[in-house]
Amino acid sequence: MLQESIKKLVQYGINTGLTPECERIYTTNLLLDVMKEDEYTDPDCDLSDIVLEDVLKDLLDAAVEKGLIEDSVVYRDLFDTRLMNCLMPRPATVQAKFAEEYKKSPQAATDYFFKLSQDSDYIRRYRVKKDKKWTVDTKYGTLDITINLSKPEKDPKAIAAAKNAKQSAYPKCLLCIENEGYAGRANHPARENHRIIPLTMNGSRWGFQYSPYVYYNEHCIVFNGQHTPMKIERATFVKLFDFVKTFPHYFLPSQPAYFSMGPMWPPMWASMMELPLDQVERKVTFMRPEQGTPAPVRGPTPKMTCAFSS
């Protein structure tokens, strides 16, 4: 059963393009090492309908039985991320492929990267599909409601382990560039299957990645290559325009300078979601305080968006 699951996971990597056929044996050996298996007989099994969630569950159950991990969602997530990294191309390969696709079009590049982020299980499709989304018509416009259910609930043992775990300042936060390839620990998620696309915005180094929780359509994160506080200044808007020139099919707002994310410096969030400002239907008048005169602006019948995280 264990060897069948290993073979299926390797085949999944080949089917999705994460792993080239020429690396079948190499990838199999990586997985055997992670699972602490010394023997392999290339089992005869059905490879026609491979469900990633099921294959990973079988491997995780085997890891628990062998005493490799504790049976909790935190340690299972750490371990299956390590398994998926065995299938993954190196960051340089991903960046080169992204650049190749970008020559076709910006959207071709992001389509490739978004698919890779899902195929790698960095974005766990089987959890994201649990999210609830619906719309409600109100007198103020259409209200979009989303309830995020894709973040797993931690069990009490995992919470205690995270509390008692040795504190580390590396990576500095959950969104620093140093997370790429990081194995994780009880109080920090694994990012071995995580890949980042480097960007240059206003002459400075930034990183581009997708959110593992997909709050909105192709929800991505753009973060500073340096762990520095967010500032709202002229350079901020130059960076925003640099991004949307590079990826014109995305929008990119900036977090306010006072916005706090605990130990994380606030990043910028991007998406392909249609926002209320895209729904222009009626005229709205705003006042310019410094002039004391009305400034007519074509605005929308509000389409509101609310997001709740459980």
Enumerate the language-model features and the residues they cover.
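Active-site microenvironments that recognize anionic phosphate/pyrophosphate groups
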Residues: 1-234, 280-304, 308
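Histidine-centered divalent-metal-coordination microenvironment in nucleic-acid enzymes
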Residues: 218-219, 224, 256-278
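Long, well-ordered alpha-helical scaffolding segments within enzyme catalytic domains
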Residues: 232-249
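A long, hydrophobic alpha-helical segment
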Residues: 248-258
